[in-house]
Amino acid sequence: MPMPRRLPGRKSMNQPAEYKTRINYSKTRQARYIAHLDTIDIICKTLRRMQLSYAVTQGCHVRPKISFGPPLPLGHASFCEYFVITLCQPPDVEKLKSALNHELPQGMEVLSVEFPWADKKSGSAGEQVDYRLHFSSRQTAEQARIWLLNPESAFQVIRKGTTRNYTIGKAVQKAELTEAGNNWLLQAEFIQGQADVPSVSKIVTALAAHLDTSRDDFYLMERIALKEL
């Protein structure tokens, strides 16, 4: 007896269940010098080594069903990186966290595993990004704070021979200075991903240029929180 023909595009009744899981991780120390695309490659190779059962895309170029958060600028540390992967079976979150941390390189650490995970509807209002900016000099930190909080602070970005002018505008929502031992922290809240609003990466690069000979006092940038607006 001939088998019934499956119609193109129709899902099989026996299609495996899929379980979306969010992995939150940090990038610190030397890992902050790993570029975004290299980070993706490291994580995908780690998942393959673990022989984790995950869903894949359809079509000619099969790849894991995985998505990543916004790129982290090179040289910035972060405690709020993440990726969302679709697994073929419900994970044991603690075992998955431990297994990933065993395989990932130094400086990359899984902080938590969230399951089940439901994607939020992405709006078009951009992102709020919180940073800790580290300084070895109070005077330099205060100079940075004043520049960041001035909406009229201006800078240029030259890319592929084209010059574009920016102002801080509404990109910096707040910047508060606190003492940390012998150093100083600038807790800054940024908005990015909106029209004519410069990214944090562009602002921080311009800030270092503005500090001029004092730029060496500005020694570490940490992304500590990220949320969609």
Range-by-range predicted roles:
Residues 79-132:
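Ordered, amphipathic secondary-structure segments that act as subunit-interaction surfaces
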Residues 2-15:
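Charged, low-complexity intrinsically disordered regulatory segments in eukaryotic signaling
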Residues 88-93, 137-140, 193:
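Helix N-cap motif at beta-to-alpha junctions
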Residues 55-87, 117:
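Short, charge-patterned binding micro-sites
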Residues 120-139, 172-174, 227-229:
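Short, low-order "capping/linker" segments at domain edges
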Residues 95-104, 142-152, 202-204:
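Short amphipathic alpha-helices in soluble, non-transmembrane regions
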Residues 19, 24-26, 30, 34, ...:
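Extended, well-folded interaction surfaces typified by the phenylalanyl-tRNA synthetase beta subunit core
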Residues 15, 150-229:
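Core RNA-modification/binding signature centered on pseudouridine synthases
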